[in-house]
Amino acid sequence: METILLMMAALIAFAGAIFHGLVGGKIYMSNIRESNLLPLTQSLSLVSWQMFTIFLLVSGATLLCVAMSPELVLLSYPILLGNVMGSVLFLWLGLTGHGALIKLPGMYLMLATAVLGWSGLH
């Protein structure tokens, strides 16, 4: 197990959570508030946005725990799978009519988290 790679993956996830939750959240909610969406739809959109932030935090925390306590290695596999699946979702949606997603960092950061995490485990 390469602890440094797991810690790098955790750092990417934590940095992504901070940027996504704070900076991205302000930009996103500004755009949502200026839209014609119903208040309930705006609220649900905010929950959806911040659930991804929570996923990034949980990813970082889990990978950091595994780096510090290798016996917890099994905890990392669902996190790594979630990051791979998220990256694939970004790519698929980006290629099927939502091209702006390809330009966003989410796909690349999730893929980097998964690759570094996997490499750190094997």
Please tell me what each predicted stretch does.
Residues 1-10, 62-75, 118-122:
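Helix-coil boundary and interhelical linker segments in multi-pass alpha-helical membrane proteins
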Residues 3, 74-78, 98-109:
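Non-cytosolic membrane-interface motifs at loop->transmembrane helix junctions
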Residues 4-7, 30, 34, 111-115, ...:
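Polytopic alpha-helical membrane-helix bundles and their juxtamembrane interface segments
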Residues 11, 15, 19-27, 40-68, ...:
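Core segments of alpha-helical transmembrane spans in multipass integral membrane proteins
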Residues 28-29, 100:
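Juxtamembrane/interfacial segments flanking transmembrane helices
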Residues 33-41:
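Perimembrane loop-to-helix junctions flanking transmembrane segments
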Residues 52, 76-90, 108-114:
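Hydrophobic alpha-helical membrane segments
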Residues 69-70, 88-104, 117-122:
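Membrane-helix boundary connector in multi-pass membrane proteins
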